[in-house]
UniProtKB/Swiss-Prot annotation:
Biological process per Gene Ontology, one example term: translation
Keyword Acetylation: no
Family: Belongs to the universal ribosomal protein uL1 family.
PROSITE patterns in the record: RIBOSOMAL_L1 (PS01199)
Gene designation per UniProt: rplA
UniProt name for this protein: Large ribosomal subunit protein uL1
Species, as recorded: Mycobacterium sp. (strain KMS)
Length: 235
């Protein structure tokens, strides 16, 4: 839905920009204002009160969305031998080592998450400049550098997603599809906010959650009250 289209303008008129909506209200309105031509993705955009340029104010982590994202993630695993077999058995879409690295260097990035066994990280470091900016670099803090590749693959396939603040102190998380029931969207939202609050750096002073907007890929932004994370009865 183009922002210049009549349908988008009509959808935007349904949003009261002077109001801060509850998570459930925002989820319901996101569904109502989304294009009916496709099952749009529902995303949360958060402006954080941190300075990402400082190492002690980096915000990153993982969240297991109780209802998933509505999309089965494609997972790449850097592993060899038994670990490679375990990853494949768990449902990994791409498994390899030097061969996988060469494919990525050649431009192949057809996956949503990457996992590596610890012994592969020295090799994976060669493509850090490719994976890092895309949020695909395996990291022990997010559970994607691990010997238990089967569990890591299962977690990601089951709805576990990573989040990381960008250079402008913004953070984006997908919480589902417009076809989801609004309560499921709100519950995914609550789970995501819980983890983001848990990841608050001790060095962050003042207001941590500065601004929150929920939107679909085809609809207008809906401002959400940062003080309300799990009051699902408000709708």
């Amino acid at each position: 839905m183009s922002k210049n289209s009549k349908a988008y303008r009509e959808a935007a008129e349904k949003v009261d920009k002077t109001k801060l909506y509850s998570p459930l209200e925002a989820a319901k309105l996101a569904k109502e204002t989304s294009s009916k031509k496709q099952d749009a993705t529902v995303e949360v955009a958060i402006r954080l009160g941190v300075d990402p340029r400082k190492a002690d104010q980096m915000v990153r982590g993982t969240v297991n969305l109780p209802h998933g994202t509505g999309k089965t993630a494609r997972v790449a695993v850097f592993a060899v031998g038994d670990k490679a077999e375990q990853a494949a058995a768990a449902g990994a879409d791409i498994v390899g080592s030097d061969d996988l690295i060469e494919q990525i260097q050649g431009g192949m990035l057809d996956f949503d998450a990457a996992i590596a066994t610890p012994d592969q990280m020295a090799k994976v470091g060669r493509i850090a400049r490719i994976l890092g900016p895309r949020g695909l670099m395996p990291n022990p803090k997010t559970g994607t550098v691990t010997a238990d590749v089967a569990k890591a693959v299962s977690d990601i396939k089951g709805g576990k997603i990573n989040f990381r603040v960008d250079k402008q102190a913004n953070l984006h998380i997908v919480i589902g599809k417009a076809s989801f029931d609004e309560k499921k969207l709100a519950e995914n939202y609550g789970a995501a906010l819980d983890e983001i609050l848990r990841a608050k750096p001790s060095a962050s002073k003042g207001r941590y959650l500065k601004k929150i907007v929920v939107s679909t890929t085809t609809g207008p932004g809906i401002p959400v009250d940062p003080q309300v994370t799990r009051n699902f009865a408000e709708a």
